[in-house]
């Protein structure tokens, strides 16, 4: 008779979870950051708020963002005036948009990832979907299963309302699934659409304006699995270790509330300070077992909550400016796409490493870190190992 431990052993993969493909997608509508304040104050009928507009222009200018992609076009906003007001009841209109757009954009990214992976989609065993937008039942995971034509017995996981740290969470979950289920191939999809958070400006709620200056729409998809099939599957990064922690004394630093007026965000001024204060401890926990204490010797993928967070982390750890190159590039070209951001940065890094003729997918280095920061204040840490190009 076979023992439970033998069954358990047979169920587990041999090697570490590996990212085998990455795909990304954005809505067609691209907005230039330099002219966005004009558009934003016009469409929200707020042009009379001249001081507030000047403040918003300064926020946009300092954001280090060149452009963002948004599902919400001028036409859509004109058809939905309640979405343009500051706190008008508008949840129905917002939900009707995002329950369609989140799976649609997610499908676009997933199709690209599946194509790069090169295996039939029938080999996908698990699906993880993450979004901060829209909550219907059955959820976006079900809609994606249908849109992609996945098998009905794919094991699905739906993560709603996590926020900006969740790009790390989906990797942590995918790693556990891939390593504990021999032959598992996990499709991960983060799809974020800001239609749920867009609203007009308010003199009394400036942290809402910060979100209006930073957030963009995007979806990213990965295929994750252990023990890649030689000659068919091409590993991009290995996931070696993961952790999640709530930063001490950080309650209320980042809050989101889904109400009749949509999703509102509240940020404390010291979010960059809280992140930079706690990052050293997270790095020691992650890299001490590997004998690494020089954080300029690893590659960096950090959720770009905003330029101030990146600046303070760089300063605190005395990082060379080029360490955050991929992170700042994604922030500049897409804005803050919540959970999808770090997956876009993974894609940017492996592509640039190949273009530049470097030895590994991680800018020529072996070890790297991926950080997610978000409501809680929650910090996700993933230790990555690059792959030779």
From Swiss-Prot:
The active site is at residue 164. Its EC number is 2.3.1.74. Transmembrane segments: none annotated. Pathway: Secondary metabolite biosynthesis; flavonoid biosynthesis. InterPro entries: Chalcone/stilbene_synt_C (IPR012328), Chalcone/stilbene_synt_N (IPR001099), Chalcone/stilbene_synthase_AS (IPR018088), Polyketide_synthase_type-III (IPR011141), Thiolase-like (IPR016039). Pfam families: Chal_sti_synt_C (PF02797), Chal_sti_synt_N (PF00195). Coiled coil: none annotated. Keywords: Acyltransferase, Flavonoid biosynthesis, Transferase. It catalyses: (E)-4-coumaroyl-CoA + 3 malonyl-CoA + 3 H(+) = 2',4,4',6'-tetrahydroxychalcone + 3 CO2 + 4 CoA. One of its GO terms (biological process) is flavonoid biosynthetic process. GO terms for molecular function: naringenin-chalcone synthase activity. It is an enzyme of class 2 (transferase). SUPFAM superfamilies: Thiolase-like (SSF53901). Belongs to the thiolase-like superfamily. Chalcone/stilbene synthases family. The primary product of this enzyme is 4,2',4',6'-tetrahydroxychalcone (also termed naringenin-chalcone or chalcone) which can under specific conditions spontaneously isomerize into naringenin. This is Chalcone synthase 4. It comes from Medicago sativa.
